[in-house]
Amino acid sequence: PEALKFNATLLLVVLASDNQNTHALSGVRILELGQIIAGTYGGQLLSDLGAEVIKIESPTGDLGRLTSIAPYRGQSGLFLTFNRNKKSMVINLKSDKGLKIFYDLVKISDVVVDNFRPGVLEKLKIDYQSLRQLNNKIIQCSVTGFGNTGEYKDLPALDIIIQSISGLMAITGEPNRPPARVGIPISDLGGGVFSSNGILAALYQRERTGVGTRVELSMFDAMLSLLSYMGTMWLTNRELPEPQGSKHEYTVPWQAFSAKDGYLVIAARQDVFWEKLCSVLNHPKLSSDGRFKTNQDRVENRDILVPILEDQFIKRTVEDWLKDF
């Protein structure tokens, strides 16, 4: 269809009257042009805070609607997950009629979110400079893969690509094994979380200034931020982190251990927890052993201590161990 098949004026009246001031973001209206995860997760988080999120799809639909992605009763489980609690519209932004409908929505909305590649907003005539002429209080948030500048800016960004180029995959997985991706689409989710954070900051700024602003963020920047102290290790002392499996670089014991019928995850950062663990293991000599007295001692003697613990945990079932903790 060229545009919506129903009366846009009636729609606007319904939307304008559908506010319930019971949540932190009640009364905030968000137009979401995003797709898949990175462009939709932020809207989901804001809808949980009470914002009215109107998901706007092209006539061909969100790519996340592919039924092969986490299928559920003939639908996409991914789409259902990230678009719950949202209203839905179909608008052909490439048509004059569709663009006018979108402009009318912008006039009565607070935020517009997208995850288009750089340059698409300008082609569709929905860039920030165009939208602010319609509503100077509008906030526009764009989630890109690599930002709007630099040699990678025009490249498509998939979660695994961002995980790899950010360095995350280099520190994920088992030692001496190929790089592994995190089990959830953390780059996509990170982009969504950071977009919601940026939108909240922009809404707060608008309360003080009375005007909107543009929020730009990239999935790549989000992942660099989430690297946190791992990135600091490299930037400060050129110490390159390596994959540790479930182990921790600076805490021992901190990993999964095999029991007779499953796995136990042990995390004994403080020495008092270490002493408690030794008591549960009925191995008091471990706590008094000078090689394992402090966490630093245990880190330095990891290769000696871990096999001792592995020999202990494999003797009993998970349920038996949990009874003693």
Report each predicted region and the residues it spans.
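Intrinsically disordered, low-complexity segments enriched in serine/proline and basic residues
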Residues: 2-9
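N-terminal helix-loop segment corresponding to the beta1-alpha1 unit
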Residues: 10-208
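Glycine-rich beta-alpha junction loops
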Residues: 60, 146-147, 219-224, 261-263, ...
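Short Pro/Gly-enriched beta-strand edge/turn motifs at strand-loop
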Residues: 62-64, 235-241
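Residue-level marker for the onset of beta-strands and adjacent loop->beta junctions
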Residues: 78, 213, 252-253
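Conserved Rossmann-fold dehydrogenase catalytic segment
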Residues: 148, 176-186, 207-223, 242-249, ...
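Oxidoreductase and adenylate-handling cofactor-binding alpha/beta cores
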Residues: 192-212, 225-237, 278-285
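Aromatic-enriched alpha-helical interface/lid elements that frame and gate functional surfaces
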Residues: 252-324
